[in-house]
């Protein structure tokens, strides 16, 4: 894929396009989160396609055993790499958004050019940044809970009950239910 732009390039182009138009359906950070999740999904699909392409085309003719199926460890490594990439992209987009917000607030017409209060503008930018961080934290927390629950389901589905003891211990802290058991009130993924 040498001639096509990367997911980050596409994500940044879409962000700049939405930022430059007057019509915005959602706040930039929420749109960025959705785009980041889509980019992470695309990355995982691409990595699995690459792994699949590394398999020998005809293992019987070469006398080799077929390549092993993707394991839980591989899936978790890819998911971790995707989360790191997601976090980096989110920070870059948040920085761009904060720069744009600072420029907008700095350029806003006040009572007089000398009457602008840079402290108030900085306070508004910090408030917007805090709100963005809270939204991002909630999204990342939900993603982490879903990732742990997915790993839990994989472990239980494969019959690896002994390996799941760590997840069973942390299940109450994360608010996850055990597959096959009724969920008590106050626990479970919302």
UniProtKB/Swiss-Prot annotation:
Superkingdom, natural source: Eukaryota
Pfam families from the UniProt entry = DUF5536
Under which name does UniProt file this protein? Uncharacterized protein C17orf107
Q: Which organism is it from?
A: Homo sapiens
């Amino acid at each position: 894929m040498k001639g096509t732009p990367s997911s980050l390039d596409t994500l940044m182009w879409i962000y700049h396009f939405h930022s430059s138009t007057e019509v915005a359906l959602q706040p930039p950070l929420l749109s960025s989160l959705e785009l980041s999740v889509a980019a992470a999904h695309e990355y995982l699909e691409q990595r699995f396609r690459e792994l699949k392409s590394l398999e020998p085309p005809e293992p019987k003719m070469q006398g080799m055993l077929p390549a092993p199926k993707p394991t839980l460890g591989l899936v978790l490594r890819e998911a971790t790499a995707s989360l790191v990439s997601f976090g980096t992209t989110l920070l870059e987009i948040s920085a761009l958004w904060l720069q744009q917000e600072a420029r907008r607030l700095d350029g806003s017409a006040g009572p007089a050019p000398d009457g602008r209060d840079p402290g108030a503008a900085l306070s508004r930018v910090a408030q917007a940044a805090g709100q963005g961080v809270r939204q991002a934290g909630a999204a990342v927390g939900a993603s982490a809970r879903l990732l742990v629950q997915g790993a839990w389901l994989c472990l239980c589905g494969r019959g690896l009950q002994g390996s799941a003891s760590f997840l069973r211990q942390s299940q109450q802290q994360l608010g996850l239910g055990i597959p096959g058991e009724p969920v008590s009130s106050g626990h479970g993924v919302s």
